[in-house]
Regions:
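Conserved SAM-binding strand-loop segment of SAM-dependent methyltransferases
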Residues: 22-29
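NAD(P)-binding Rossmann-fold cofactor-contacting core
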Residues: 2-17
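Phosphate-binding loop of NTP-binding sites
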Residues: 18, 32-36, 45-192, 196-200
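Residue immediately C-terminal to the conserved phosphorylatable aspartate in receiver
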Residues: 9, 27, 45
């Protein structure tokens, strides 16, 4: 029971999203001017942390979270049935290959598993799919992990770290810290042949 508004500067994209989701939409500048209307902001991973709307929302004490974080919370709250197993793969290189291999291994082991996130279907589609997916093998980017404050996967894989997306994160340390969040998993797998990964 929440009121949802879509904010997008691209009018065509906003209109399309409004039609598909059957919700109202506004320009981000209007949302910025009317922040008091909102209780939280769910952001696209494409929006950088220094986006005026997101900075203002955080300064106003609003929670800013990503779509993956929202899906995780809904899943853990059993909104779509019993919580799923989350296996999250990240790193600078090799994410897609590793995620695909891991999903295939889980499928061959008899699990209803699917590669999701940045490959395959979105996490939102996966958790709400009519045919239940029990194991989400998710390839997640540093952008998605940045906006994930409560996401603790059942299995977390950090393959490697190299300088990437510094313009988005602001520093190598911030980029690496976002990636390293997956190591909070009860079962964490790290590429320890990588000197940067060893620091986490």
């Amino acid at each position: 029971n929440v009121d949802v508004l879509i904010a997008d500067a691209n009018e065509t994209a906003r209109d399309r999203a409004m039609e598909v989701a059957d919700v109202a939409g506004i320009h981000p500048d209007q949302a910025l001017a009317e922040l008091s209307r909102f209780s939280c902001v769910v952001t696209s991973p494409g929006w950088r942390p220094d986006t005026p709307l997101l900075r203002a929302a955080q300064a106003a004490g609003l929670e800013v979270l990503g779509d993956v974080e929202l899906c995780y919370r809904l899943d853990r709250a059993s909104v779509f049935g019993p919580p799923r197993t989350w296996m999250v793969v990240t790193g600078t290189n090799g994410k897609t290959t590793t995620t695909s291999m891991l999903a295939s291994i889980m499928q061959h082991a008899g699990y209803q598993a699917e590669a999701v996130g940045n490959i395959g279907v979105s996490v939102a589609e996966a958790v709400s799919a009519p045919q239940r997916i029990d194991v989400l093998v998710a390839e997640l980017s540093s952008f998605q992990l940045h906006w994930s404050s409560q996401l603790v996967p059942d299995v977390g894989v950090l393959l490697n770290l190299a300088e990437d997306h510094i313009d988005w994160h602001g520093s190598m340390a911030a980029y690496a810290a976002a990636k390293a969040k997956v190591l909070a998993a009860p079962l964490a797998i790290a590429g320890l042949d990588d000197a940067l990964v060893q620091q986490y």
